[in-house]
Amino acid sequence: MVREPFNALSHALGVPLALLGGLLLLLLAPREAWPALLAFGLTMALMFGASALYHTLKAEDRLLAWLRRLDHAAIFLFIAGSYTPFLAEGLEGGDKALALALVWGLALLGVGFRLLY
């Protein structure tokens, strides 16, 4: 039995839709934009996948708490993934490198914090 049917279904549907949308973006974009668009599409799919797992599984409290932390950690990654195309295409040189390092560094700190606490 599914723990939260609507959330589970809507978030599970988000995974293939995110992958399909990401693929369409790749087909429409120049090759130099592909790494940033891959970060966007894959982190979106990861976020929906982690959320679908959390909302689907009926499990003991300890496992649910871990899945909830994974769900929240994936949100940090998607925030960085959604900034990436804008920063990669909108900035140049050192500004781009600094902004990407800052956004991804903060996201990884958030992931680490959320997985540990």
Where are these regions (language model features)?
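Multi-pass alpha-helical transmembrane bundles in non-GPCR membrane proteins
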Residues: M1-Y117
